[in-house]
Amino acid sequence: MSANSHPPNSKNVLCNAAAGAAAGVVAATFVCPLDVIKTRFQVHGLPKLGDANIKGSLIVGSLEQIFKREGMRGLYRGLSPTVMALLSNWAIYFTMYDQLKSFLCSNDHKLSVGANVLAASGAGAATTIATNPLWVVKTRLQTQGMRVGIVPYKSTFSALRRIAYEEGIRGLYSGLVPALAGISHVAIQFPTYEMIKVYLAKKGDKSVDNLNARDVAVASSIAKIFASTLTYPHEVVRARLQEQGHHSEKRYSGVRDCIKKVFEKDGFPGFYRGCATNLLRTTPAAVITFTSFEMVHRFLVTHIPSEQSSIL
């Protein structure tokens, strides 16, 4: 994945989709416990760690508390939909992103910053619409240990069926508006990532496609921290809207009402609730995702025969 674009073909589509899916699975498995904590912080606010046996930071204390109450299963609650969501998310995203870059590039195959932002935004919109139901299920599964008096969901597919039956399409696509607002995240992250890669390539006197894993890790971590810090508030709003279900008290009537109530209760810091945990989770996840994608993609490009050679 480079700032320059390559002509689209079935090999590129296959390599992008397969590498994106592999990267999503690896990242989801690695960061799931921190994702559970982040989601609960966003939805229910900071926990009260009154147990004298719980020591250390809020994050460590929350991990210990969840493990004590719900076991290892609690730390990996929602792993299945997280894997499914991230697998499909990155498979769709990297494929769409590459196709849109090819469509928007100039005659000399160069991509302007504006075109890069547009490609990232378009891929983000398509991915968000396609995967929103899985993110709703993930949020519900990760927080259902804290919801009293509600029959828990048994699995990802049973949750999808039940939400569709009880709440209809609105339930499956709850939180879609703030999720689409989150397109600004990838619109910032991916062009920033591309620009940092170009800078590192020039500094190391090599091509972007020949950057090593360390360079990719540096570029992806800086881009992720920058984009996450600027766009985090929409994640809080999205998580709160997705968490409230058919059987729970309807706390928010919509995006505007949610923003108003969060601000009234917690002020501006309320929109950054769980941000530190989120950065601890998303920065390594971004490094894992982008490094895995780049390495797997290079392997596939090298080993999968091109259309012309397969015909011959």
Curated annotation (Swiss-Prot):
GO biological process: NAD transport
Summary of the tissues where the protein is detected: Highly expressed in young leaf mesophyll cells, root tips and at the branches of adventitious roots. Low expression in all flower tissues and not detected in siliques and seeds.
Subcellular location: Plastid, Chloroplast membrane
Native source organism of the sequence: Arabidopsis thaliana (Mouse-ear cress)
Miscellaneous comment in the UniProt entry for this protein: Appears to be a chloroplast envelope-located membrane protein lacking an N-terminal-located transit peptide.
Protein known as: Nicotinamide adenine dinucleotide transporter 1, chloroplastic
Main function: Mediates the NAD(+) import into chloroplast. Favors the NAD(+)(in)/ADP or AMP(out) antiport exchange, but is also able to catalyze a low unidirectional transport (uniport) of NAD(+).
Keywords: Antiport, Chloroplast, Membrane, Plastid, Repeat, Transmembrane, Transmembrane helix, Transport
Cellular component per GO, a single term: chloroplast membrane
One Pfam family recorded for the sequence: Mito_carr
